[in-house]
């Protein structure tokens, strides 16, 4: 790829960032489509995020992806949020239109799309959702919008717990889905929720390096063959949770599905063009 002075810059702001496959995936897609953009990753934490957004405007960047730990904070630095992003309370995509910043969340649509592409119909189903960060709440919100009957959200009593309660209230007030929030330390409630669940989704970083030997499911007998287990983590590709699920006879969806579909939507938001899906799946080895 020969970058010229006509190229526009798209970023990814997160910390840590060096594990991300998004720059490789997006640049392969941009090159295949012959579009004058280049995508770069920047290590940006909460403290440096405000300055990074000012830099985005000053450099007239086309936009940026936003990942941990900035997804919720980023909502405060855009001029407009989509209705779904307001429901989530977090964004993973910023589009810069001549200094006017629009915030989107493609995590939820990407993950739910991956589930649908597997042939699973979420309408009327119950999901056990682990975590209350930006990715997890995006998945929950989009699932509620698209027909989930119930979401049982489990999170530790950490800094995200009150945010989880606020998220549940927003979804309960604006959709037909019923969301409850329970402390993950209540293992009896967790076991009962899994017994009646159709989907278990990990929206936390547990399972991602350096936590690759950990899972929030402490007892594999809680997983049953009728359960669909989905993962947001893609590094490593096969997390401990997915290994447990396969041993228990569950159908599984790895983190590549969400990465691919959320990235495809981001690509279109930034460029206005279709994402070369099959090409990217092939060159990135997704689904192989």
UniProtKB/Swiss-Prot annotation:
Keywords: Amino-acid biosynthesis, Aromatic amino acid biosynthesis, NAD, NADP, Oxidoreductase. Coiled coil: none annotated. InterPro entries: Aminoacid_DH-like_N_sf, NAD(P)-bd_dom_sf, Quinate/Shikimate_DH, SDH_C, Shikimate_DH-bd_N, Shikimate_DH_fam. GO terms for biological process: amino acid biosynthetic process; aromatic amino acid family biosynthetic process; chorismate biosynthetic process; shikimate metabolic process. It comes from the Bacteria. Its EC number is 1.1.1.282. GO terms for molecular function: quinate 3-dehydrogenase (NAD+) activity; quinate 3-dehydrogenase (NADP+) activity; shikimate 3-dehydrogenase (NAD+) activity; shikimate 3-dehydrogenase (NADP+) activity. Homodimer. This is Quinate/shikimate dehydrogenase. It comes from Escherichia coli O1:K1 / APEC. The lineage of its organism: Bacteria, Pseudomonadati, Pseudomonadota, Gammaproteobacteria, Enterobacterales.
